[in-house]
């Protein structure tokens, strides 16, 4: 890969951030929704630094999914490979924050929309301008998303292939 776009595949979710630090989940009075998910965060950070990034995933066709899409688009991320589905909801992660900064997560994603993203939704031609593919291990569970990752790894053009074709 020697193009100019960072591609990231995997989860985008809503982190439910507690209004109070240092207490257990059952003691938290309220939570605030924030866009999260490591692959989405990597795209956002790279775009904010002036890079070109594209996000591949699937969100629920629900208010949280549309909130995530609006916020990622506002960062300047290419969302042309983002899908929506009514077959599952957008993933949620409730976060507990300790005084020392450590975190505990409780995930709601059985299955979530991102895990249903499948190889059939990917066109290898998208990656002609890719310089890197980022992904995280969370999406490698036995799901259609796992096979979408494998599809990318086996079909994305490598720098050696590009040099041979010149």
Each language-model region and where it sits:
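Conserved small/polar residues in nucleotide/adenosyl-binding loops
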Residues: 154-159
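Glycine-rich phosphate/adenosyl-contacting loop at the front of the ribokinase-like
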Residues: 1-78, 117-119
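Short secondary-structure boundary/capping segments within folded domains
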Residues: 45-48, 84-85, 160
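Conserved N-terminal subdomain of the carbohydrate kinase-like
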Residues: 52-137, 142
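Charged helix-capping and loop-helix junction motifs
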Residues: 147-151
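Flexible, glycine- and charge-enriched loops at secondary-structure boundaries
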Residues: 32, 142, 146
């Amino acid at each position: 890969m020697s193009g100019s776009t960072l591609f990231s595949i995997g989860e985008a979710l809503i982190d439910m951030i507690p209004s109070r630090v240092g207490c257990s989940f059952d003691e938290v009075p309220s939570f605030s929704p924030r866009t999260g998910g490591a692959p989405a965060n990597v795209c956002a950070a790279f775009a904010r630094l002036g890079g070109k990034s594209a996000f591949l995933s699937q969100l629920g066709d629900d208010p949280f999914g549309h909130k995530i899409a609006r916020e990622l688009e506002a960062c300047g991320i290419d969302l042309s490979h983002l899908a929506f589905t009514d077959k599952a909801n957008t993933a949620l992660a409730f976060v507990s924050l300790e005084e020392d900064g450590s975190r505990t997560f409780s995930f709601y994603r059985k299955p979530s929309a991102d895990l249903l993203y499948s190889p059939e939704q990917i066109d290898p031609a998208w990656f002609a301008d890719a310089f890197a593919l980022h992904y995280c291990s969370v999406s490698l569970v036995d799901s259609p998303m796992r096979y979408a990752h494998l599809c990318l790894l086996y079909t994305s053009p490598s720098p050696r292939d590009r040099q041979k074709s010149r």
